[in-house]
C-alpha cells in the first residue's frame, strides 16, 4: 500500500477524504469483513498515514455492506494455511496503538465480533446501527480476547458486565451496548455515516 497521493488504491479497504474527515471502509463483505494479514497491514498503513497527515482531523472506520462491521480474524484464511501476522500496532493498526493524537470513530454497521469488537473498543467513539451487535466469542473456543478486549471492556463498562460478556461469549445488541456504556449512540442504519460525520 502506498500513500494516497501516489494514487495506488488499497485492495481490501477504501479511503474517502472530505474536509479532513477520513472515511475508512473495510471491504471484504464476502468474509463478513474479517481481516487477514494483508487487510490488517493495509489498514495499519492507512491509519499511519492518517496520523501523519496534518490536514487529517478525524477518521471514521466502518465495514462494507449492512451485515458486518468486522468479524475479527479471518479464521478461514488461517485454516487454509495462511500465515498469522499482525501489525506492530495491532488489528487494523489500532488495537495496540496507544500514541494516537486524533480521534477515530467506529461506525458499526453490523456484527462486530472478536477482533472486530476489539477494533471498535480501541476507537474513541462507537456509533452503532440499530441492528448492530457485539461479542467476544473467543472463550467458547478456548481462546482469549488478547487484542484489547480483556482490558478495554472492563475499563469502559465495569468488571462484572465485562466478565459476563468475556466468559460467556454472549452477543450484545446495540441498544444494550448503549445501556452498558461502550456504545455512544444508536441510529438507524441508513443514518450511520452521516451521524458519525456530525
For each feature predicted by the language model, list its residue ranges:
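Hydrophobic/aromatic residues within transmembrane alpha-helices
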Residues: 24, 61, 74, 119-121, ...
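Amphipathic alpha-helical interaction surfaces in cytosolic regulatory modules
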Residues: 66-75
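Conserved CoA-thioester-binding segment of acyl-CoA-metabolizing enzymes
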Residues: 1-66
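An acidic, glycine-rich surface segment that forms the CoA-thioester-binding/catalytic face
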Residues: 41-48, 52, 75-109, 113, ...
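Short glycine-rich anion-binding loops that position phosphate/pyrophosphate groups of nucleotides
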Residues: 65-67, 110-111
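Crotonase-fold acyl-CoA enzyme core
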Residues: 98-198
